[in-house]
Amino acid sequence: AIAAVITFLILFTIFGNALVILAVLTSRSLRAPQNLFLVSLAAADILVATLIIPFSLANELLGYWYFRHMWCEVYLALDVLFCTSSIVHLCAISLDRYWAVSRALEYNSKRTPRRIKCIILTVWLIAAAISLPPLIYKGDQGPQPHGRPQCKLNQEAWYILSSSIGSFFAPCLIMILVYLRIYLIAKRSNRRGPRAKGATREGESKLPHPMAAGASASAKPPTLTSSLAVAGEANGHSKPTGEEGETLEDPVTSTLPPSWPALPNSDQGQKEGVCETSPEEDDEEEECGPQAVPVSPASAGSPPLQQPQGSRVLATLRGQVLLGRGVGAAGGQWWRRRTQLTREKRFTFVLAVVIGVFVLCWFPFFFSYSLGAICPQHCKVPHGLF
């Protein structure tokens, strides 16, 4: 029964991790640089399932090491290498999540495939540094029961403690601290979320607001015109036209934020130009020249204001205000930023669950393994439990 369950787990591990690698390498949506961590982690798990678990199962079922002594040394080194690599990969992924959440703009520009590959190489080098000492220094293998060969990990106390700290306890501590920090950042971001939603968007706060109700009756609401106002024809009213006589849409009013109330068109109630009188001046006759264009006093006599492509011009009684092309785009950037943070937090939560389960599975082994080195005489761990 044990052999059947372990065999099923081996096949399931190989199949599942192969699907992960295939999905990342073939799907365009999964070709982000950080997903290379998942490819390397899946490769380490496949190596554990193919090169470690079958021989470990045979050793447990037979009760002794059936294979050659040389393969025993290589097997133990590979066991430590692949298992340590899996744990350190999870530590690297947690650090990547933390940097992506805490310093998104700065880190995303640095998160290149080359940088991720360098981190993965560092992970494998750390795992190799922990797994190589048993090949160099074998130490005391202990007695051989019934004269049968055994294949056990190094029993030296210094190696047990150092390998346990480097392979499990240090990465586990880093992951706990990192995910605690991510939780605090997410909590603080959620607190600031409602206030950020109600805040005025950057750029729109620079726009002059319509006059409030109750203002002086002689006050005139701002008149919106294009910076390239075209005079009307000598007889009758007309809107600005293009080169072929097609009616052009007012470039200012068409790009105003939706929160602005609709204002009367600049050509309604006006003759031969862009002019308007206040309510007190309705009884008086005021003629506008055919070339009249509203400009500020400071700009009188100066060349007309050039309107860059993609920009907008707001003309009021006090003059013209040139709005850059970035006005109104801050809101979209804010929503994109918030969407990215939400996606990062969701992915971080999933990884936290995976890492939590992984740590719970590894903790009993490393705890009992270290306990035998700390107090070998009084803290005997049963062989079946180990």
Swiss-Prot record:
<feature type="compositionally biased region" description="Acidic residues">
    <location>
        <begin position="278"/>
        <end position="288"/>
    </location>
</feature>
<dbReference type="InterPro" id="IPR000207">
    <property type="entry name" value="ADRA2B_rcpt"/>
</dbReference>
<feature type="compositionally biased region" description="Low complexity">
    <location>
        <begin position="289"/>
        <end position="304"/>
    </location>
</feature>
<keyword id="KW-0297">G-protein coupled receptor</keyword>
<feature type="site" description="Implicated in catechol agonist binding">
    <location>
        <position position="163"/>
    </location>
</feature>
<keyword id="KW-1015">Disulfide bond</keyword>
<feature type="topological domain" description="Extracellular">
    <location>
        <begin position="375"/>
        <end position="383"/>
    </location>
</feature>
<keyword id="KW-1003">Cell membrane</keyword>
<comment type="similarity">
    <text>Belongs to the G-protein coupled receptor 1 family. Adrenergic receptor subfamily. ADRA2B sub-subfamily.</text>
</comment>
<feature type="transmembrane region" description="Helical; Name=1">
    <location>
        <begin position="1"/>
        <end position="25"/>
    </location>
</feature>
<feature type="transmembrane region" description="Helical; Name=7">
    <location>
        <begin position="384"/>
        <end position="386"/>
    </location>
</feature>
<dbReference type="GO" id="GO:0004938">
    <property type="term" value="F:alpha2-adrenergic receptor activity"/>
</dbReference>
<keyword id="KW-0807">Transducer</keyword>
<feature type="topological domain" description="Cytoplasmic">
    <location>
        <begin position="181"/>
        <end position="350"/>
    </location>
</feature>
<dbReference type="InterPro" id="IPR000276">
    <property type="entry name" value="GPCR_Rhodpsn"/>
</dbReference>
<dbReference type="GO" id="GO:0051379">
    <property type="term" value="F:epinephrine binding"/>
</dbReference>
<feature type="site" description="Implicated in ligand binding">
    <location>
        <position position="79"/>
    </location>
</feature>
<comment type="function">
    <text>Alpha-2 adrenergic receptors mediate the catecholamine-induced inhibition of adenylate cyclase through the action of G proteins.</text>
</comment>
<feature type="site" description="Implicated in catechol agonist binding">
    <location>
        <position position="167"/>
    </location>
</feature>
<protein>
    <recommendedName>
        <fullName>Alpha-2B adrenergic receptor</fullName>
    </recommendedName>
</protein>
<feature type="transmembrane region" description="Helical; Name=3">
    <location>
        <begin position="73"/>
        <end position="95"/>
    </location>
</feature>
<dbReference type="GO" id="GO:0009986">
    <property type="term" value="C:cell surface"/>
</dbReference>
<dbReference type="GO" id="GO:0019229">
    <property type="term" value="P:regulation of vasoconstriction"/>
</dbReference>
<dbReference type="InterPro" id="IPR017452">
    <property type="entry name" value="GPCR_Rhodpsn_7TM"/>
</dbReference>
<keyword id="KW-0472">Membrane</keyword>
<keyword id="KW-0812">Transmembrane</keyword>
<feature type="topological domain" description="Extracellular">
    <location>
        <begin position="63"/>
        <end position="72"/>
    </location>
</feature>
<dbReference type="GO" id="GO:0006940">
    <property type="term" value="P:regulation of smooth muscle contraction"/>
</dbReference>
<feature type="topological domain" description="Cytoplasmic">
    <location>
        <begin position="26"/>
        <end position="36"/>
    </location>
</feature>
<feature type="transmembrane region" description="Helical; Name=5">
    <location>
        <begin position="157"/>
        <end position="180"/>
    </location>
</feature>
<keyword id="KW-0675">Receptor</keyword>
<feature type="region of interest" description="Disordered">
    <location>
        <begin position="193"/>
        <end position="310"/>
    </location>
</feature>
<comment type="subunit">
    <text>Interacts with RAB26. Interacts with PPP1R9B. Interacts with GGA1, GGA2 and GGA3.</text>
</comment>
<dbReference type="Pfam" id="PF00001">
    <property type="entry name" value="7tm_1"/>
</dbReference>
<feature type="transmembrane region" description="Helical; Name=4">
    <location>
        <begin position="118"/>
        <end position="140"/>
    </location>
</feature>
<feature type="transmembrane region" description="Helical; Name=6">
    <location>
        <begin position="351"/>
        <end position="374"/>
    </location>
</feature>
<dbReference type="InterPro" id="IPR002233">
    <property type="entry name" value="ADR_fam"/>
</dbReference>
<feature type="disulfide bond">
    <location>
        <begin position="72"/>
        <end position="151"/>
    </location>
</feature>
<dbReference type="GO" id="GO:0005886">
    <property type="term" value="C:plasma membrane"/>
</dbReference>
<keyword id="KW-0564">Palmitate</keyword>
<dbReference type="GO" id="GO:0030168">
    <property type="term" value="P:platelet activation"/>
</dbReference>
<feature type="topological domain" description="Cytoplasmic">
    <location>
        <begin position="96"/>
        <end position="117"/>
    </location>
</feature>
